UniProtKB/Swiss-Prot annotation:
The gene is gltX. Its EC number is 6.1.1.17. A motif ('KMSKS' region) lies at residues 240-244. ATP binds at K243. This is Glutamate--tRNA ligase. It comes from Rhodopseudomonas palustris (strain ATCC BAA-98 / CGA009).
Length: 473
């Protein structure tokens, strides 16, 4: 009988939720959801000096923002240290592990000698079969696994294929340190086994760990989970991903104005493919996702592609939901608190009214907010340099005449204001563009905006006439 699928995401809380970690979590989540299984969350907080509550909170918050939920309670690895020690003692009692009394100086000498001789195995196994009665006084022993000395350790990986290591090149790895704390290798195996994990989906930088962990599984006579080591994310030029390329926390993408659905869609296509399809609903991702469709080559991060995809999601979003997203964004950007004080029902209504025109022009929520700035700008408007260049003395006189032509328009709509401006332009012998641009500058402080008659309608009669008065001669 096939066991139900259980995946896990197991980040170390030493910083933010990295974009690569977000993709790993997404792949685990998709695979579990596709197979009607569960995805567990384990915080690998055994590095007590580097693990922080702030980082844990950032990871949990990042996952929730991405729309990735997990099943059951969060497991904290450090809290399970007694269980990890118990397994090490079991292996010791079964003769599958041993106490190593090598001093730090001896270990350094062994490593230096091995490197000088070009040997991969750095520990010489000197305490493997040595009588513990020969132990030197005052040395706290580690517990090491008695790894096989001959043959090979093989992982049949769902992404990488068959990967083999010669056992003669693998050390007897440390299970418990001299102070009694378990090592990462032991803790991961024990936790995955006890949590019932059936599939380990993680970055291919963990591939060598898989060989060492399999030796622990074999020693304990536990079933090895299915392994899938996914390619890392590189920069557009193929080099290691840096902050310049996009090696940022998920929280940074939120602050840059990316929609969680867009980032999810982009991440799923980094290393995984499904024909030529680029845009997926969440359900389509779940239905289509599978491990064999993940490539072995490093995926290349492309900001332009992410922006384009984000723009698509913005255009497809409901106007009301975009207003909510904009308001939520304010918590994460420097200028947010000042703008948040202006958000009231009137501003929300104006944003919703303007959104059809605004969202066609924006690739991120930051751009969307910037383009909507005219709605909550304070009078007199701050003019950008291009707008200032438009406002010559002659233009200011024209704005005064435009204001007079608009003063009696009723009702105040995009259609009625457009009719008034067309009539004014015709009467003055001007092209409509010669009228529209001064209006745009006076009403928005910029030379680009949504359709000028939409701007007039959104701002309303009183605000428009006041802004025109501010800029007229």
């Amino acid at each position: 009988m096939t066991r139900p699928v259980v995946t896990r995401f197991a980040p170390s809380p030493t910083g933010f939720l990295h974009i690569g970690g977000g993709r790993t979590a997404l792949f685990n989540w998709l695979y579990a959801r596709k197979h009607g299984g569960t995805m567990l969350l384990r915080i690998e907080d055994t590095d007590r000096q580097r693990s922080t509550q702030e980082a844990i909170d950032a990871i949990l918050d990042g996952l929730k923002w991405l729309g990735i939920d997990w099943d059951g309670d969060t497991v904290y690895q450090f809290a399970r240290a007694a269980r990890h020690r118990e397994v090490a003692e079991q292996l010791l009692a079964a003769g599958k592990a041993y106490r190593c009394y090598a001093t730090a100086e001896e270990l350094t000498a062994m490593r230096d000698k091995a490197r000088a001789e070009g040997r991969a195995k750095l520990y010489d196994g000197s305490w493997r079969d040595r009588d513990p009665s020969e132990a030197p006084a005052g040395v706290k022993p580690t517990i090491r696994l008695k790894a096989p000395l001959t043959g090979e350790t093989v992982i049949e990986d769902q992404v990488q294929g068959r990967v083999a290591w010669q056992n003669e090149n693998l050390d007897d790895l440390v299970l418990l340190r001299g102070d009694g704390t378990p090592t990462y290798m032991l803790a991961v195996v024990v936790d995955d086994h006890d949590m019932g994990v059936t599939h380990v989906i993680r970055g291919d930088d963990h591939l060598i760990n898989a060989a060492r962990q399999k030796q622990i599984y074999d020693a304990m006579e536990w079933e090895l989970p299915v392994m899938a080591h996914i390619p890392l994310i590189h920069g557009p030029d193929g080099s290691k991903l840096s902050k310049r390329h996009g090696a940022l926390g998920v929280d940074a993408y939120r602050a840059m104005g990316y929609l969680p659905a867009a980032l999810r869609n982009y991440l799923v296509r980094l290393g995984w493919s499904h024909g030529d399809q680029e845009i997926f609903t969440t359900q389509e991702m779940i239905d289509a996702f599978d491990l064999p469709a993940i490539g072995r080559s490093a995926a290349r991060f492309d900001f332009a592609k992410l922006e384009s995809l984000n723009g698509h999601y913005i255009r497809q979003s409901d106007d009301h939901s975009l207003v909510t997203l904009l308001e939520d964004l304010l918590k994460y950007i420097p200028q947010g608190p000042a703008i948040a004080t202006k958000f009231d029902d009137s501003i929300r209504a104006k944003l919703t009214q303007a959104m059809p025109g605004l969202k066609e022009r924006a690739k991120t929520l930051i751009e969307l907010l910037d383009n909507a700035g005219f709605i909550f700008a304070d009078r007199p408007l701050a003019l950008d340099p291009k707008a200032q260049a438009v406002l010559t003395p002659e233009t200011r006189q024209l704005i005064g005449r435009l204001r007079a032509a608009l003063e009696d328009v009723s009702p105040w709509t995009a259609a009625t204001t457009e009719a008034a401006m067309r009539a004014f332009a015709e009467q003055a012998g001007l092209k409509l563009g010669a009228v529209a641009q001064p209006l745009r500058v006076a009403l928005t402080g910029r030379t680009t905006s949504p359709g000028i008659f939409d701007v007039l309608a959104v701002l309303g009669r009183d605000e428009c006439l006041s802004r025109l008065a501010d800029q007229s001669a």
